[in-house]
Amino acid sequence: MTSIHRGVLFPVYLPAVFLGVPAQAVLILLPLYVLELGGGVAAASAVVGLRGVGMMVADIPAGMLAARFGDRVVMLFAMILIGSAYLTYALVNEVSWFYLLAFINGAGSSTFLLGRMSYITAACSPRERGRVISMIAGSMRGAALLGPLAGAALAEFIGFEATFMCLAATVVLGFLCVAMTAIDDPPDLKKMRWRAVTDLAFEYRGVFATAGIASITFMLMRAARTVLIPLLGAELGLETTVIGLVVSVSAIIDVALFYPAGMIMDRHGRRATAVPSSILFAAALAALSLANDFYSLLAVAIVLGVANGLSTGIVMTLGTDLAPAARRGEFLGLWRLLTDLGSAAGPLTVSLAVTLGSIQAAALCVGALGAAGSLVVYRFVEETLK
């Protein structure tokens, strides 16, 4: 292991695993447990949705907390929120509690992610960030595969309550890693002011209007991709197992490229992955509208896997590069809000386009938005590796 990775193994990489796997497990456990407690499908959907709402609502306050109290303190506070939510899931049996708990869970997740981004910005040089962030993104992809499987298996054998307690215990391990190894950064004890955030947004309006829009587009395309492939597979009459195979092949290609993407960013610049991946993304999403059988869907899914893998870490890396040292927390809070909006906009765009037209129209619509975003990346997003 190189010195680049040794320095962040305990404060960054291990907590990413200890929090990432439970976070992915919760995505399947929460709705299923709500159903088991007697809640309906609407209640289960609302609980999952409120977790996402909690993430967006907490983005800017988390940035303000990081600016005032420091990244380490914010990460520790966030893990207390997350672990407490997991533990309380196991202790309550009224569905009404889960609305509040899911919101707190989401707020804690957002706060931790922001604290980690800010910590990496301070702890890693610009020529290290691409690889470090790509490693984190790779661990998130691994967690997305392992988390639901492990969570479902545990729930089957030991029950939901004990499973949530296991998730809370895993978060404790992440807490200990950060508490014992993360470097304290001097906090800024100025009062937290919303006016300071709005002033920052105005001061960096050019950055948010270019690189910010590019990042929104990346997140929108990624989120839309996860919805479009299975929906189109169902539209073509493919069996569930066949659709799963298509998604899995795309995911394997994606995972294989996460670290090479980080190396390219650190050696040749951020645009070296941002420009080609955005163009590939837009073209492949539009090409989904032409897929009419298993082989054509698989071919497009492979290209989407390449695009997603090549773009690994680009959004977080751009954010850390562009964040001003003196206002890092507030800037990253605004940055995360933009990216969360992009993630939410992807499925909503697909839903609206399908309602008004068809799944093919949805693919074309997202592809067109991606093309506009790739133009912004090519024409207006400057190289941030200095």
Where are the language model's segments positioned?
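Juxtamembrane intracellular "pre-TM" segments in multi-pass secondary transporters
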Residues: 1-6, 183-211
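Helix-loop boundary and gating motifs at the non-cytosolic
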Residues: 5-52, 209, 222-232, 236
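C-terminal membrane-cytosol helix-exit motif in multi-pass small-molecule transporters
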Residues: 169-188, 373-381
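Cytoplasmic helix-loop-helix junction between adjacent transmembrane helices
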Residues: 103-140, 318
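Helix-breaking motifs and short loop linkers at transmembrane-helix boundaries and internal kinks
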Residues: 38, 70, 91-93, 269, ...
